[in-house]
Amino acid sequence: MKKSLFLTLTLLLPLAAPAAAQQATVRLTIKDHQFQPSQPRAPANQPLTIIVRNLDSTAAEFESKTLRVEKVVAPGGEITMLIRPLNPGRYHFFDDFHQDTTDGDLTVE
């Protein structure tokens, strides 16, 4: 049984590597209550990872109604979100705690 499992995994592993390479990553930083970059881009129809690092001394809440995500980022902390494949378009995001200064748009093409 162990040999057949090992053989199966050995044969399937090369197929998994190209699929993992297809995932795009967007990295955002919050500093002085501003997203950097505030206008990131990502490829359409692929899973997406968004990483948000908060360099401010206060908490932030990354939120996007169009992306269907909402997560608190502690001061000096970092969060990672896995996003479903997206259609081309613009997806607005903001810091719910500082909406007047902290927002941006993800362009998917």
Question: Positions of the model-derived regions?
Answer:
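Bacterial N-terminal signal peptides that target proteins for export
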Residues: M1-L7
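Extracellular/periplasmic metallocenter environments
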Residues: A20-R27, Q34, V73-E109
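Beta-strand-rich interaction surfaces with strong enrichment in secreted/lumenal proteins
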Residues: S38-P40, R68-V72
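N-terminal signal peptide c-region/cleavage motif recognized by signal peptidases
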Residues: P14-P18
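Asparagine-centered strand-capping/turn motif at beta-strand->loop junctions
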Residues: V52-N54
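Structural beta-strand segments of beta-rich domains
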Residues: S38, Q46-I50
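Short beta-strand/loop motifs in extracellular/secreted proteins, especially
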Residues: L48, T58-A60, T102-G104
